[in-house]
A protein has these predicted regions:
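Small-polar-interrupted transmembrane alpha-helices in polytopic inner-membrane proteins
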Residues: 19, 98-116, 163-174
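Membrane-interface helix-loop-helix regions
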Residues: 13, 20-77, 110-121, 196-202
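Structural preference for long, well-ordered alpha-helical segments in enzyme cores
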Residues: 4-8, 18-22, 82-90, 242, ...
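Membrane-interfacial loop-to-helix junctions in multi-pass inner-membrane proteins
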Residues: 1-17, 33-42, 85-86, 154-157, ...
Length: 297
């Protein structure tokens, strides 16, 4: 159990805390140095202990909109760390026959909490108990493919048609979300179906051995950049902010499509470059230490 936590720490914490240092220290100092005044409303202590999602809820519900994206982006990582703090305990201390019941209980509790707060969009989107639904459904699929042979075989031998069906289901739920869930508890329970469709796609992509063009492992570019996704997620607000500052410094107006398009492309390219540098020369040092805490004997 200790090795699991250490491996998690070595992968997540180094970049997470580097972003916090930038967002709460370096960025405000840089703004002050060039004469830009700005008040930071986020509470750094919430971020330090992985409770930033609650800080974000507080700011949104007190109508504080000027939240730097480099500070706000941490909320989902906080929820993941909260989740992974207790999730391994289920499998470490409960008998195997209780695992499925525990996973289903987490999902049920999250759905009930979402229904209780069906009118509060901030709670539905950022509260830990609301988002546990996604992680619980992911855990359910992981349980099924590792503990149930039929589920494992189904996803391993999945056909192109079924792959396509999963994508159609997902995009249909996304595009027709408002129409499909336009009822009292729709906002609360609509997430169940969307999360389920995402879990189907992820599990199929992770498990499939079928030779199908919808097996995204065949897309080498996407596979290559897959290891950089955590870096891209946390660093893209910083790169967007830098690009925005540059456009202001050089008086580049964002009033036409061409300028906006060029700015967007440059921001994306910068994000990929910075993310690769971060992973190759910073994060990888800690990742290489993970072998000392192997969870497989």
């Amino acid at each position: 159990l200790g090795n699991f936590y250490m491996r998690r720490i070595l992968r997540i914490w180094p970049l997470y805390f580097a972003v916090i240092i930038f967002a709460f220290v370096a960025y405000p100092l840089a703004k002050s140095f060039i004469g830009i005044k700005g008040e930071g409303f986020a509470n750094i202590m919430y971020h330090m202990v992985f409770l930033s999602n609650f800080d974000l809820i507080h700011m949104k519900q007190t109508n504080i909109d000027a939240i730097p994206t480099s500070q706000a982006i941490n909320w989902s990582v906080s929820i993941e760390e909260q989740f992974y703090l207790f999730w391994p305990l289920i499998f470490a201390f409960l008998p195997k026959k209780m695992w499925l019941f525990s996973i289903l209980s987490v999902i049920a509790i999250s759905i009930l909490f979402r229904m209780q707060n069906y009118e509060n969009k901030d709670i539905l989107y950022f509260h830990t108990l609301s988002v546990l639904l996604d992680l619980g459904i992911g855990g359910l699929f992981a349980f099924l493919v590792t503990q149930k042979k039929q589920a494992e075989e189904f996803f391993k031998n999945i056909s192109t048609r079924t792959h396509c069906l999963f994508f159609v289901l997902f995009f249909g739920l996304i595009f027709y979300n408002q129409e499909l869930f336009d009822f009292k508890y729709g906002l609360a329970i609509g997430r169940v179906f969307i999360s389920f469709s995402i879990a189907l796609i992820i599990t199929a992509q992770a498990m499939t051995t079928s030779n199908t063009f919808l097996n995204l492992k065949n897309f080498k570019l996407g596979t290559y950049w897959g290891k950089y996704t955590y870096s891209i997620y946390l660093l893209h607000p910083i790169c967007l902010t830098f690009s925005d500052v540059c456009s202001r410094v050089f008086n580049i107006p964002m009033v036409n499509f061409i300028n906006t398009f060029i700015w967007g492309v440059l921001a994306i390219v910068l994000t990929f470059i910075v993310s690769k540098i971060s992973y190759d020369y910073y994060e990888s040092y800690f990742i290489r230490l993970k072998h000392k805490f192997s969870i497989l004997k």
